[in-house]
Amino acid sequence: MTDTLDLDRAVATLTQGGVIAYPTEAVWGLGCDPRQEAAVLRLLEIKRRPVEKGVIVVASSVDLLRDWVDIDALEPARRQDVLASWPGPHTWILPVTARAPRWVTGEHDGLAVRISAHPVVAALCAAWGAPLVSTSANLAGEPPARSRAALDPALLATIDGVVDGETGALAQPTQIRDARSGQILRD
């Protein structure tokens, strides 16, 4: 059985390169330290997701993302739209800086980021104090889990712990919109 982690143990697990599961706005997510290449590659291997696709990164504030994204490169109106939507269930593709790691961006010139208002995600990000990978807790091509009970036992056997809680009220995973063009990539 996978351990249930309080916030302190979750932070310790992330620091050690671990992969954890936690509830998000609509589905359960998998997370790890995006600054640790080995942790991200392990998470992607668990999901059977190609590194080329990139991952979503969540944080407790925009300032924690500034090393990797250049929000100031956006047109002022688009930048205002992004900032006004956070914290909240809005994932935006932002232009990346040269420091954004390829194991996070994949083959893209943007990075999907969110400042979440979900209580568990917000508390985890605040306690962690750094960006966190947030990708659905399922194998690639399988439906995402909407409850802890729905998490795949085989997936649970490969991760390092679970932060308990309930998913939010969204019926679908968060919309993903490119902040540069306004194009909706996932609705």
UniProtKB/Swiss-Prot annotation:
One of its GO terms (biological process) is regulation of translational fidelity. GO terms for cellular component: cytoplasm. The keyword RNA-binding does not apply. Gene3D superfamilies: DHBP synthase. It is found in: Cytoplasm. Its EC number is 2.7.7.87. GO terms for molecular function: ATP binding; double-stranded RNA binding; L-threonylcarbamoyladenylate synthase; tRNA binding. Residues 4-187 form the YrdC-like domain. It catalyses: L-threonine + hydrogencarbonate + ATP = L-threonylcarbamoyladenylate + diphosphate + H2O. Pfam families: Sua5_yciO_yrdC. InterPro entries: DHBP_synth_RibB-like_a/b_dom, Sua5-like_dom, TC-AMP_synthase, TC-AMP_synthase_SUA5. The keyword Cytoplasm applies. Belongs to the SUA5 family. TsaC subfamily. Required for the formation of a threonylcarbamoyl group on adenosine at position 37 (t(6)A37) in tRNAs that read codons beginning with adenine. Catalyzes the conversion of L-threonine, HCO(3)(-)/CO(2) and ATP to give threonylcarbamoyl-AMP (TC-AMP) as the acyladenylate intermediate, with the release of diphosphate. This is Threonylcarbamoyl-AMP synthase. It comes from Xanthomonas euvesicatoria pv. vesicatoria (strain 85-10).
